[in-house]
């Protein structure tokens, strides 16, 4: 599918995918329900409100004056540490920001000047924390030890604590597996807490706890046990370690009394051979009664997932006009690059849903069909052969839902692509959903028999962008490809001033026009921004705040930090020095080795400084050495050892520097490097074997 872009310039006007030009006064959506608790001067919840709209109605910062935005204050929460990334989005009440760090510290920070009012430690090791909840005078936080804490909002003192994920919760082998994850949500005397661990065989569950005492009010098991609805979608005892974890926070409709929770993929994540069936409630959104945890309805977006396509992004609630009728919808998705827009009361697909036949592999027990919603995807659903993010050569490629077995198959958007877990924003002024997306290939194989999942092929390019999608039609209004993947926590905040904010892996926070998506202001924060900006007001002055600390995915070399920033009109705090941006390619991380020989099909023994003694056709690092550094003019010899059992061939890709041809065991090929550069190459026969040569 040809990439379609929305192009808007100073003189071009608003030209989109068949969408008329909009003005500042355009209002194309019904009045939204006030029951979600829309943010005013506060931003009291991660994603702003119970509907996860990530919209602030504050309007003093506008498209016309945003150029005057500057740093109001800046604080390094962890003393300037660059050792850890940060995924926590702040929440704000009465001029105070509350935020966690990966180092398991919870902070209360004065929103005027950045002064730390209190700090409470809830653990000693590092763990992903994505946001606290506020309610009943308390701050609720999870910890790496699977303890939920209630802290006094004024002092940070511990009010109560509750241990979760214990062996006595369940008689399944996965009952004690996993760790708490996702932002905490507070509503009507309960707090809602999720967990992660599907890649390790945890059995997913969602918790509701009494906010006053910490007692567990209910638990919803997402891999149902015997006698429970959905257990028959798991073969044998596979439900016991079935995964299906809720690692992102839910949305809540107070009027319907429903919690909308999304659940991850099943376990094993890329091998379906032992878990025949649809595997409910993996890859599903489930509407649960807020007070009891009773299932009201569910929708599964991927049956029997073997691609790590868990559409776990926090769902968004909105009211939209569809066929001249106001519909209360939940927007769900989407790594697969398309949204599932469902009726909040019934789960009905408001734009229709078609179960389409998909490619099959009997060994993987693949589902015969997969659901496709009415509308159009916001990213392509097949590899982009002519683009920078084209697949690494020699891999098999396929469209969405092409199965794999012993050899990797590249699909697109991959497990880190589409809209992964960046916070969406629903803008009541335009009526659109805004999403940051990734353009990333995945190349999974079945991990049995010593095979390894390549997941993201080495040497491939990462990219991404932002899209605006009209939920009334489930079609993109505009799509803007950019240089960075923006799918991993890079939340979008929209505001009443018609300005939206989003940060990127390079540390730059952008302000954009909410109609065109054009960048109208930028600021360097000092570390990758993989959280969502928030907005609040003190004494009539509007602030924007964000925590910049980086994230390990999809860029392992992203600049990390602990920078909490606030901005206001006329702010005078200068931007941070620009950090070294991450590599736009999935880089080889092995240390550089000097020499003039590369041995094919062998893993480098770093302790002896020699190639391994056995052939390896499945490992990504089966080039010895995997990272070679040579001077211009050096001749490098590529060798297929005589005791290897297979032919090999080393071919540089994207740069077209060398091609050894097929080398039988005992053969070699020499190539002289005449120009400096970085050259990735892989094996034309066993493509996951990948190396890098840097010529200086």
Give the residues covered by each predicted segment.
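Repeat-blade elements of multi-bladed beta-propeller folds
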Residues: 40-47, 83-105, 125-148, 176-205, ...
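C-terminal substrate/ligand-recognition segments
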Residues: 92-94, 99, 417-517, 521-523, ...
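Extracytoplasmic copper-binding redox domains, predominantly the cupredoxin/blue-copper superfamily
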Residues: 582-696
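Beta-propeller blade signature
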Residues: 205-213, 281-290, 464-470, 562-570
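Aromatic (tryptophan-biased) beta-strands that constitute blades/sheets of beta-rich domains
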Residues: 29-81, 85, 115-122, 157-166, ...
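Phosphate/diphosphate-binding loops
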Residues: 321-355
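Blade-level signature of beta-propeller repeat domains, shared across WD40, Kelch, NHL, RCC1
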Residues: 535-578
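N-terminal export signals
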Residues: 5-24
């Amino acid at each position: 599918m040809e990439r379609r872009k929305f192009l808007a310039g100073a003189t071009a006007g608003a030209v989109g995918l068949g969408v008329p030009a909009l003005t500042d006064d355009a209002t194309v959506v019904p009045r939204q329900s006030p029951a979600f608790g829309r943010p005013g001067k506060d931003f009291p919840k991660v994603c702003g409100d119970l509907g996860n709209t990530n919209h602030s109605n504050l309007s003093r910062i506008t498209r016309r004056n945003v150029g005057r935005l500057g740093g109001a204050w800046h604080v390094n929460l962890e003393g300037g540490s660059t050792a850890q990334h940060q995924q926590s989005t702040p929440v704000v009440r009465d001029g105070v920001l509350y935020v966690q760090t990966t180092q398991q510290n919870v902070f209360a920070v004065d929103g005027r000047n950045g002064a730390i009012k209190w700090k409470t430690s809830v653990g000693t090791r590092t763990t992903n924390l994505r946001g606290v909840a506020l309610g009943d005078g308390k701050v609720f936080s999870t910890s790496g030890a699977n303890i939920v804490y209630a802290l006094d909002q004024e002092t940070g003192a511990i009010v109560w604590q509750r241990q979760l994920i214990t062996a006595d919760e369940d008689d399944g082998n996965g009952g004690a597996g996993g760790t708490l994850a996702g932002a905490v949500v507070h509503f009507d005397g309960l707090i809602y807490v999720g967990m992660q661990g599907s890649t390790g065989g945890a059995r997913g569950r969602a918790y509701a706890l009494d906010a006053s005492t910490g007692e567990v009010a209910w638990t919803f098991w997402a891999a149902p046990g015997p006698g429970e609805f959905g257990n028959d979608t798991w073969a044998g005892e596979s439900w016991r370690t079935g995964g299906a974890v809720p690692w992102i926070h839910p949305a809540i409709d107070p009027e319907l009394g429903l919690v909308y929770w999304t659940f991850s993929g099943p376990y094993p994540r890329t091998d379906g051979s032992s878990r025949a069936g649809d595997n409910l409630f993996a890859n599903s959104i489930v509407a649960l009664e807020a007070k009891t945890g009773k299932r009201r309805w569910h929708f599964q977006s991927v049956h029997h997932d073997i691609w790590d396509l868990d559409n776990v992004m926090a769902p968004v609630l909105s009211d939209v006009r569809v066929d001249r009728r106001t519909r209360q919808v939940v927007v769900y998705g989407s790594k697969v690059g398309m949204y599932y827009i469902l009726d909040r009361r019934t789960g009905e697909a408001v734009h229709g849903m078609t179960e389409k036949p998909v490619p099959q592999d009997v060994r993987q027990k693949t589902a015969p069909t997969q659901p496709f919603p009415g509308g159009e995807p916001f990213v392509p659903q097949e590899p982009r052969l002519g683009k920078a993010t084209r697949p690494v050569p020699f891999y098999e490629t396929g469209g969405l839902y092409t199965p794999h077995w012993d050899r990797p198959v590249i699909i697109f958007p991959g497990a880190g692509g589409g809209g992964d877990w960046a916070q969406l924003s629903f803008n009541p002024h335009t009526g659109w959903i805004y999403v940051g997306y990734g353009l990333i290939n995945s190349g999974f194989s079945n991990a049995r028999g010593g095979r390894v999942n390549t997941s993201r092929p080495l040497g491939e390019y990462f990219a991404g962008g932002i899209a605006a999608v009209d939920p009334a039609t489930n079609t993109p209004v505009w799509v803007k490809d950019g240089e960075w993947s923006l799918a991993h926590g890079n939340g979008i905040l929209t505001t009443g001033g018609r300005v939206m904010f989003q940060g990127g892996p390079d540390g730059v926070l952008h302000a954009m026009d909410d109609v065109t998506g054009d960048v109208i202001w930028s600021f360097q924060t000092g570390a990758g921004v993989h959280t969502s900006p928030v907005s609040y007001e003190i004494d009539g002055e509007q602030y924007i705040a964000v925590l910049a600390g980086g994230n390990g995915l999809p860029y392992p070399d992203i600049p990390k930090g602990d920078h909490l920033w606030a901005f206001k009109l006329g702010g005078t705090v200068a931007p941070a020095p620009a950090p070294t941006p991450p590599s736009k390619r999935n880089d080889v991380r092995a240390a550089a080795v000097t020499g003039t020989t590369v041995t094919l099909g062998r893993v480098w023994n770093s302790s002896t400084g020699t190639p391994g003694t056995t052939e390896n056709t499945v490992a990504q690092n089966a080039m010895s050495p995997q990272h070679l550094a040579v001077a211009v003019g050096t001749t490098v010899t590529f060798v297929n050892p005589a005791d290897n059992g297979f032919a090999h061939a080393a071919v540089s890709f994207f740069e077209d520097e060398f091609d050894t041809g097929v080398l039988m065991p005992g053969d070699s090929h020499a190539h002289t490097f005449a120009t400096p550069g970085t050259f990735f190459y892989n094996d034309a026969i066993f493509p996951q074997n990948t190396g890098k040569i840097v010529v200086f």
